[in-house]
Amino acid sequence: MGVNLSGRSFIKLLDFSTEEIEYLLALSKNFKDMKRAGVPHRYLEGKNIVLLFQKTSTRTRCSFEVGGMDLGMGVTYLDPGSSQMGKKESIENTARVLGRMYDGIEFRGFAQEDVEDLAANAGVPVWNGLTDLWHPTQMLADILTVQENFNYDIKGKTLVFMGDAKNNVARSLMVVCSKLGMNFVACGPKECMPADDVIDACKPIAVENGCTITLTEDPKEACTGAHVIYTDVWVSMGEPDSVWTERIKELTPYRVTTELMALADPSAIFLHCLPAFHDTNTTIGADIAGKFGVTEMEVEDAVFESKQSKVFDEAENRMHTIKAIMYATLK
């Protein structure tokens, strides 16, 4: 029997089988091919979706908006000041209202419980555009990019996450690698390792799919022979300078450098979910340089701008993979 995701919400990848994830990736490739060939694919004409954003975004918002319009749907965007959710109206009641008006709901915010409450009460598919715990839509874009660079043969390849390996991206990468048979390495200081509950959930999945999960504090050991080296920002915006001071001190040894990339497999690629602090050409980058004397944070500019860097392919793939998720769950 073929994969059927119609009516399903997309909350975290632990909810999906290997076959279902592979189906979404294949569908993403098909949509990318159609987009590039200029083939119309307004398969969801007449449907409408709403995007609920507690956190700002470039890639997630644009991917849902362009992807939705490519599929023929109407798209409504609500920022924190445009809805009553969580203020004058509970999340449960917001879900019940929006579920009467829209065919699908995207949520990007803080608490995982919020997106789960939406999904439990909306009566329509709900898609997790990011929470503090998980970033599942990012994962499909990441893996599609890996597939494209390794001839769609990714089983047995090794992905290394460098830096704050307890964050939502690293947690999600551990899950998707385990589901798809890729070896996952978390490399960072001991206090920045993934939570035990995530490791415990992923270990049996990794065994089933013939891959490994490794935790190490040694960057050279982690990167030697790796096929994908991935990193993310060290601190969330808005946190006090004291947090920046501490994080820069503890995570600087885990900056992705040309020296570390040279230890990786000759075919290795660099990934980052963006935005990245690789220079001083942003207000925040300049501010960090002024306060802390650091001109590059989680990745050297030379790596970010190198041929090994596939970050903009990865960013484009957000649109194609999100389109696949919407189509598969709404068709």
PLM region descriptions:
Residues 1-62, 66:
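Positively charged, low-complexity intrinsically disordered leader regions
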Residues 36, 42-147, 278:
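Phosphate/diphosphate ligand-binding glycine-rich loop within oxidoreductases
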Residues 54-66, 151-232, 237-239:
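Glycine-rich phosphate/diphosphate-binding loop of Rossmann-like nucleotide-binding domains
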Residues 98, 118, 221-222, 303:
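Structural alpha-helical scaffold elements that stabilize or flank donor/cofactor-binding regions
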Residues 154, 178, 259-267, 306:
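Short, conserved loop/helix-junction motifs that constitute active-site signature segments
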Residues 204-301:
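Rossmann-like adenosine-cofactor binding region
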Residues 284-331:
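C-terminal helix-to-coil terminal segments
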